[in-house]
């Protein structure tokens, strides 16, 4: 592509006129934007006329070589009214028609300024001229003729785009992480090609949570299940719209006919649960485990009812969808500094959340921890050497409760600061809403342990403020994952209310509660209320009396009664219904676990409320 350019003589402007004449045409100070536009139009017209006139006078014309073979040399010239106070002006872009050697025309964009014009240089390699006759001395005076590497690279990219006949405005935008995170990534499951998704809504996946192969499914099966789930959701939404009486308030809490039918249906489905696995099924499951190990999900068929298994599958798909949304938003990054596992005693625990351990420990991915003093270390060798000389066999503080092998220690955050800080960092690995890490001095920690011949092993703990303005009896509560679903969480809750009874106070846990914490507390409140109603023989009952006897906050009592549909409003009064079916169900459960020692005995508590702390 060749461009015709008028040769510039020394001491003249680009249009062949003298510098003084052209600078007079360019003078404009303190004028409005509209005046500036009209003047620019006039200057372009005069320049075109002079260019035509100079062409008629047989001015010499040079042809530049094609952009594809050699890069054209540009020179820039700045003409101002005053040499002492140059005023920079933002360049404006104008489309120009340039003719290729082949005869085709394409639009290119060239920058023009109110005070700048771009010309092609002669064969000489002299520096660009300025009003003072010297090369520019500051970065603000340097234009495209400045020889730097970044500029050369940008010119080369522009030339390649011009050769292809594409517009610079069509250049692809830079992708952000959430738009390009999946490039050069693949699923970590062995043998998986990253196709499909557990939710059935995505074509690819890059994590185990969305891998169909890990969940022993195919991509087509996931799509079929997604369609079935969407259909069920639509039917449920339609039933809610048609149900005008679906209100859960104090005045109307009776379940609707549709809800009762659904409850009966669920009860029938759960009765179809198989009593146990056959010998062939056990062999099949063991073979699957030996073949794939931890790279595949265990086979779950026939372990529970079809309804519960389908409910679990839907929960898995929903969790995978939420994780995919977070990953697309950039909130989940690969290789983030998060501890994946911890070696704690004879257990290896997978962590759930991020904990603010020091950077040199957080980036390891695997942390080694002493189960007695809770000191964290980087390697197995350091842990082995530490255990050889660690003299701790139980938590610090005072042992205030012991029954059998279960003990509870009261640890003051002010006296044992390091231990309590390590305990909080450990708890954050399994709690989402925990914010207390280092400021432990205003808190008391009650640590529950189980003793054997090697020492007192940590089961869980709860903390509470020494002086709580709102009478919170629990600030944070945790049961270690290896002891979950064994009744220890309810024992910790019961022990916190036992301390409130000794203090003669009404207590309540600090909000917000975690998901597992809320489930545990609702179960405990339900059990307390049903036990109280079972032993109550009067005709009139008071929420205040229940609160004083059980140390449970009245707000928690009312919310539990509403959840059990035992609180009604009739003839201007609130009534508490004594539902015998719920009480009988609770009695049957108590009879099954009567031999269990997972209860707190008030006679084993040796403790007096602290004063002046």
Curated annotation (Swiss-Prot):
A zinc finger (CCHHC-type) spans 178-221. Keywords: Acetylation, Acyltransferase, Centromere, Chromatin regulator, Chromosome, Cytoplasm, DNA damage, DNA repair, DNA replication, Isopeptide bond, Metal-binding, Nucleus, Phosphoprotein, Transcription, Transcription regulation, Transferase, Ubl conjugation, Zinc, Zinc-finger. There is a cross-link at residue 340 (Glycyl lysine isopeptide (Lys-Gly) (interchain with G-Cter in ubiquitin)). Phosphorylated at Ser-52 and Ser-55 by ATR in response to DNA damage, promoting its ubiquitination by the CRL4(DDB2) complex and subsequent degradation. Phosphorylation at Ser-52 and Ser-55 by ATR in response to ultraviolet-induced DNA, promotes localization to DNA damage sites. Phosphorylation at Ser-59 by PLK1 during mitosis seems important for prereplicative complex formation and DNA replication licensing, and requires prior phosphorylation at Thr-87 and Thr-90 by CDK1. Phosphorylated by MAP2K1, which accelerates its degradation. Ubiquitinated at Lys-340, leading to proteasomal degradation. Ubiquitinated by the CRL4(DDB2) complex following phosphorylation by ATR, leading to its subsequent degradation. Its main location: nucleus. The active site is at 510 (proton donor/acceptor). Catalytic subunit of histone acetyltransferase HBO1 complexes, which specifically mediate acetylation of histone H3 at 'Lys-14' (H3K14ac), thereby regulating various processes, such as gene transcription, protein ubiquitination, immune regulation, stem cell pluripotent and self-renewal maintenance and embryonic development. Some complexes also catalyze acetylation of histone H4 at 'Lys-5', 'Lys-8' and 'Lys-12' (H4K5ac, H4K8ac and H4K12ac, respectively), regulating DNA replication initiation, regulating DNA replication initiation. Plays a central role in the maintenance of leukemia stem cells in acute myeloid leukemia (AML). Acts by mediating acetylation of histone H3 at 'Lys-14' (H3K14ac), thereby facilitating the processivity of RNA polymerase II to maintain the high expression of key genes, such as HOXA9 and HOXA10 that help to sustain the functional properties of leukemia stem cells. This is Histone acetyltransferase KAT7. The gene is Kat7.
């Amino acid at each position: 592509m060749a461009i015709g350019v008028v040769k510039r003589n020394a001491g003249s402007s680009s249009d062949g006129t003298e510098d003084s004449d052209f600078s007079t045409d360019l003078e404009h100070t303190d004028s409005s934007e509209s005046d500036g536009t009209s003047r620019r139009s006039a200057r372009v017209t005069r320049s075109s006329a002079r260019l035509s006139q100079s062409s008629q006078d047989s001015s010499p014309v040079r042809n530049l070589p094609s952009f594809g073979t050699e890069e054209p040399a540009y020179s820039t010239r700045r003409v101002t009214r005053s040499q002492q106070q140059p005023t920079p002006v933002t360049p404006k872009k104008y489309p120009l028609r340039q003719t290729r050697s082949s005869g085709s025309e394409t639009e290119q964009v060239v920058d023009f300024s109110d005070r700048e014009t771009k010309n092609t240089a002669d064969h000489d390699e002299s520096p660009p001229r300025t009003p003072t006759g010297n090369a520019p001395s500051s970065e603000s005076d340097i234009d495209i003729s400045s020889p730097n590497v970044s500029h050369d690279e940008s010119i080369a990219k522009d030339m390649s785009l011009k050769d292809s006949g594409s517009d610079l405005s069509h250049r692809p935008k830079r992708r952000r992480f959430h738009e390009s995170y999946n490039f050069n990534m693949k699923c970590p499951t062995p043998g998986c090609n990253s196709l499909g998704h557990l939710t059935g809504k995505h074509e690819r996946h890059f994590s185990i949570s969305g891998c169909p192969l890990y969940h022993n499914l195919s991509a087509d099966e996931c799509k079929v299940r997604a369609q079935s789930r969407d259909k069920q959701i639509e039917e449920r939404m339609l039933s809610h719209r048609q149900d005008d009486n679906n209100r859960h308030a104090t005045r109307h809490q009776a379940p609707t006919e549709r809800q009762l039918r659904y409850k009966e249906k669920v009860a029938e489905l759960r009765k179809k649960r198989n009593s146990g696995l056959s010998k062939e099924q056990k062999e099949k499951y063991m073979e699957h485990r030996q073949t794939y190990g931890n790279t595949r999900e265990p086979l779950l068929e026939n372990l529970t009812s079809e309804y519960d298994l389908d409910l679990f599958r839907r929960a898995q798909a929903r969790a995978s969808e939420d994780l995919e949304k977070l990953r697309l938003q950039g909130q989940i990054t690969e290789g983030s500094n998060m501890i994946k596992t911890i070696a704690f005693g004879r257990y290896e625990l997978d962590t759930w959340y991020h904990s603010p351990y020091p950077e040199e420990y957080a980036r390891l991915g695997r942390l080694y921890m002493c189960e007695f003093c809770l000191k964290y270390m980087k390697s197995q060798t350091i842990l082995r050497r530490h255990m050889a000389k660690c003299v701790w066999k139980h938590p610090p503080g005072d042992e205030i409760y012991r029954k059998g092998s279960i003990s509870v220690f009261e640890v003051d955050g002010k006296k044992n600061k390091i231990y309590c800080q390590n305990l909080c960092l450990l708890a954050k690995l399994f709690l989402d809403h925990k914010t207390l890490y280092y400021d432990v001095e205003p808190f008391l920690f009650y640590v529950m342990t189980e003793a054997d011949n090697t020492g007192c092993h940590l089961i869980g703990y709860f903390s509470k403020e020494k002086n709580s303005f709102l009478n919170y009896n629990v600030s944070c509560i945790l049961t270690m994952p290896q002891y979950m679903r064994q009744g220890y969480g309810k024992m910790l809750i019961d022990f916190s209310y036992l301390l409130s009874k000794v203090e003669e106070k009404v207590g309540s846990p600090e909000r917000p509660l975690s998901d597992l914490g809320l489930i545990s507390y609702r179960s405990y409140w339900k059990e307390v209320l049903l036990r109280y109603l079972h032993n109550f023989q009067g005709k009139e009952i008071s929420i205040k009396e229940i609160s004083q006897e059980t140390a449970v906050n009245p707000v928690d009592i009312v919310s539990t009664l509403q959840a059990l549909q035992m609180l009604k409003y009739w003839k201007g009064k609130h009534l508490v219904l004594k539902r015998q079916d719920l009480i009988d169900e609770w009695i049957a459960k108590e009879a099954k676990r009567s031999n269990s020692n997972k209860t707190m005995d008030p006679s084993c508590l040796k403790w007096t409320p602290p004063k002046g702390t």
